[in-house]
Design a protein with these regions (language model features):
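GHKL-family ATPase ATP-binding module
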Residues: 1-227
Length: 227
């Protein structure tokens, strides 16, 4: 593109690395889209195309981590123009990394799509672990934080008229997408767990270990305060 002098000014400069990362991100968010970045200042050129979409995105984010399950991904389009795509994978770390997008725009503060995802994720996994007997007598029900420990996830929604909390679009507030994300995540994740018992066991074990560690830490704090 040719930048506008009126918008960018005479002393405009473009950071190659910033453009590289954003175009790579867009290729993950739009499966099959081919993007070429050519920097005529130094001759650098990069081609971006992801046939795997969000599944490849999650694999990329976890490339330096030891993963627990194969990437889980689904895409659901509704009759009223909304679409939900999600991919997730657990690794053996203790940090959560969940990225949220609306119409290819990143929301650093999440919003209604993230809220629906978290609710469905916790409910689906706790119901599964209870039904399959992973939770033993005396075990506390794992919290949302326990469930998301070591989770890498990407949520991408498409909305015809999205609403955000501010002009920077850092948080999605469109309430109509929350039940769609929640319903579809619960359904597809439950199917994945039932169809992949080996990986489901690995995920359940990590979550229960996180829950027990949290409870042990709480009891240790209480003992310290009593002394």
């Amino acid at each position: 593109f040719i930048p506008s002098l009126e918008t960018f000014g005479k002393n405009r400069t473009f950071n190659h690395d910033t453009l590289f990362k954003r175009l790579r991100e867009l290729s993950f968010l739009n499966s099959g889209l081919s993007i070429i970045l050519k920097d005529e200042r130094d001759g650098r050129s990069s081609n971006f195309k992801s046939d795997g979409g969000l599944q490849e995105f999650v694999t990329f984010l976890n490339k330096k981590k030891s993963v627990i399950n194969k990437p889980f991904r689904f895409l659901r389009e509704t009759r009223d123009g909304m679409a939900v795509e999600l991919a997730l994978q657990w690794n053996d770390s203790y940090q959560e990394n969940t990225l949220c997008y609306t119409n290819n725009i990143f929301q650093k503060d999440g919003g209604s799509h993230l809220s629906g995802f978290k609710t469905a994720l916790t409910r689906s996994l706790n119901n599964f672990m209870e039904k399959e007997g992973y939770l033993k007598s005396g075990d506390l029900t794992p919290s949302g934080e326990d469930v998301r420990e070591g989770l890498t996830a990407v949520i991408s929604v498409k909305l015809p008229d999205p609403k955000f909390s501010s002009q920077t679009k850092d948080k999605l507030v469109s309430s109509e997408i929350k039940p769609v994300v929640e319903q579809e995540t619960y359904k597809h994740l439950n199917d994945f767990l039932l169809e992949n018992p080996g990986e489901a066991k690995q995920i359940a074990t990590k979550i229960i270990d996180a829950s027990r560690a949290r409870e042990a830490a709480r009891k240790a704090r209480e003992m310290t305060r009593r002394k």
